Each structure stands twice: as structure tokens, then as C-alpha cells.
Amino acid sequence: MSPEDVRERYEQVRDEVGPDVTVVAATKYVSLAELGVLAEAGVGVVGENRAQDLETKHARYGDAFRWHFIGHLQSRKARQVSDLSELVHSLDSESAAKRLTVPALVQVNLSGEESKSGLPPERLEAFLETCPVEIRGLSTMPPFAEDPEESRPYFRTLRELAERFGLRELSMGTSQDYRVAAEEGATYVRVGTTLYGGSHR
């Protein structure tokens, strides 16, 4: 993984999704040493999945990036995540919301898969009415599919939900379907494999 390769791929993704979409580099499988390559490549926003990894990486490269949290948010880690990131993409519990002090996107489970985090859509309205933190939008993770078009109905449904509640930000789309997500109104896409190649997810 060289800075030149990452920069080329990063710029390609940015060109594909357009100026209104923020490309978040997913760093779950990026080592501490490799983060320096991302910084050298000009990556601006990174998304971390685990609070402990966020703490470790932020301690070394805190000023090099804007930090987002994109993994499942445990209530007991919410304050730690708040101290280190500017936006949480994955809020889905009242207990975590009470401890969070940075803006968030509510994660919605549109597929009904038990393996996926997120609120069921029928609970979204009540959650938004009582949520004590600033909610800027919604996020979702559709079922994995080889064909990106299979993700489109989920992205469209999320956009319609956001419009219903007057929310502007949409975090949806990963390496295999970010182009479709952008077409359906994503304002954040999370990419890993696309930036780093086959050895990273």
C-alpha cells in the first residue's frame, strides 16, 4: 500500500461520487503504521469501528484526519468515542444517546437481519422525539450482495425516511455499492477495499 496508489484511488472515488459526498476511509483493518500512508495520500476523513482502536490511532494521528466512528456504539464507550470523534454514524440506543456529546446519525436496520445493528424503522420516530443529542441524519448497512443494484432499494428507503423526518445526512454505501449509494442521495460513503486493495476490507 503506497501513498501514490491510495491517493489515486481516493481521488477516483471522490470523482465518482461527486463534491456533495464525503468519502470516509474505513480503517478497521488498517494498522497504525499504515495510517501514515493514508495521511500522506491526502485522505481527509477516517472511520473507525472500535473505541479502543479509535483511541490508539487517534493518539498517534489525531491531527492528521477528521475522525468519525462507524462501528457499533456500546453505551459504556459513548463518552470515550465522543472525546475522539466529530460524528457517530451508528447510534441505535437510548442509553448510548444519553452519554454521547457529539452529533450522530441514527443507524436503521432496514433488512431485519438479526446480525445487523440498528433500529427497526418503526421505532425511528419515537427515538428521534426523545433523543438528547443532535441527530444529523441516518445510516444503514444493507445485506451484502455481489450486485450493487440489490442495495438500491435499501438506500432509497433510507433517503425517503430521512426526508420524512427532515434529516439531511445519509451514511450508506461501502466499497461494493458506493456508486449506487451516491446516486440515491448518500452524503457519506465508507470505503476500505476500494482504497487499499485486496489485502484490506
Regions found by a protein language model. Give the residues of each.
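Conserved alpha/beta-domain cores
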Residues: M1-Q176, A182-E184
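Expand to "…catalyze enediolate/carbanion chemistry for C-C bond making/breaking, isomerization
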Residues: P3, R179-E183, R190-H200
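Short alpha-helix boundary/capping motifs
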Residues: R66-W67, V189-V191
